[in-house]
Each structure stands twice: as structure tokens, then as C-alpha cells.
Amino acid sequence: MKMKQVHKTLWRWASIAWFACLSARAQDVQFLPEADANLKLNSTVRVYLQAKDDRDGGDPTQLTIGPSIQFYLKPLLKLKDITTFDLDDSKSRALVLETGYRSVTAPGAPPENRMETIATFHFPLKARFLISDRNRADLDWKNGGFNWRYRNKLTVERSLSIHSYHFIPYIAAEPYYESQYKKWSTTALYAGCLFPVGKHVQFNIYYEHENNTGKRPNQQQNYIGLALYLYFSLAKK
């Protein structure tokens, strides 16, 4: 299969997923769009800008936008080998530290300011599987009040191929502890796939199920997500 044909096929899949997600909005399944633009400054530092429809932890429809900066360790040979076809080269690092700011806005609600601090560990396994352990703390200021939450996302993924094209299916689980409820109030489960297109574009198409117990009655939420990741670099190869 020629690479040009693969690219056309992927764009077609992305279009189908987009329209499927739009039709799902009228049903119980909701659509979560996202776009991230990443710029690698050197071998150990990357910045990115993120814009997404954020309904994490049972939040209402809201727009989250803001920048982040990431700091890497040097890549490990084993990790670099099993993530060769993933455009996100942070996965080849055993530890990635990150901090960022997000402006959170929602219709009819006061704006929210969020600071994010994240530490992600990557572990290579046998049979070319990769485990990612992301530990994230959100510090939220809204209308004079303050809340925080801790999120621990564990992801298992493995690159597969059809002819010469490689894609990356994954599953993940993420529990949340939220200070406003003083308990582990949310559990999110994910199943998705990463589709690289060329050297700079990667799509993430996924299904997410959330169980929220912070408010009564408990809420079950289902989402289909479509994320566009752009990767650029100023670092010399």
C-alpha cells in the first residue's frame, strides 16, 4: 500500500469519525473535540498550546485553552525502539515533567483559572507494549473559591501495522480525587487509537466512559473524542 493511499484513507476515516460524532451529539454519547500544537525547542524541552471541549469529572460543557511546557529526561533506547512510529517523542523518555495554565470558560458561568502540574512515567514491557503512568494535579480558582483534584491515568498501548502503515491502539483508566467532594468521585475508562499522518500530524480517536459519584444521583457519561495533534521541532536532529 502506497503511503499516499494510506494518507487518503486516514483522512477519510477521520471525516467519517467526525460526522459520526456529530450525529452522536443527539444521542446519549457526546462529542469531545480537541486540538494540540506542539513545538519541540530542544532535546529536553517542548511547549504546546491546547484547546479542547472539557467535560472531565462530570463538568458541564466548557472550553479549555492554554499553554504548557514539558521537560524531558534523555530517551531510553528500549522506549525509543517501541515508540518509533509514534509522533509524540515524549513517550521515549522515562520521565516527563509538565506545568501549564488553562483558561476555562462555560456559557452563563464565571471564568475559571487552572494550573496543571503533571509527572508522567513510561515503562517498556515485553512484546513491545508501553505503559504510561500520568499523575496530574489541577489547581482551580473560580469566582473567589479554590478547589483541586488529582488524576492518575494508566495507559497501555502497542504499535500495530497494516502493510507499511503503523497505528497505535490503546486502553486507559483514570480515577479522580476531587477536593470539593472529599473523595475519589470519578472513574474514566478509555479505548482508542492513534493514527499518524506524515511527519507532523496525528489523530487520536477514542471512546470514553465516565462514572461520576460526586453528586446525587450518580451520573454515567459516554463520549466519543477526536483529537488533532500537530508536532513541530526547532531541535537539530
Model-derived segments and their meaning:
Residues M1-F31:
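Bacterial Sec-dependent N-terminal signal peptides
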Residues V29-F31, T61-I65, P111-M115, F146-N152, ...:
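Residues that define the transmembrane beta-barrel architecture of outer-membrane proteins
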Residues P33, T44-D56, K80-D86, R93-P107, ...:
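Transmembrane beta-strand segments that form the barrel wall of outer-membrane beta-barrel proteins
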Residues Q62-F123:
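Hydrophobic/aromatic-rich structural module bridging two neighboring secondary-structure elements via a short loop
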Residues L73-L77, F123-K215, I224, Y229-K237:
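Outer-membrane beta-barrel transmembrane domain signature
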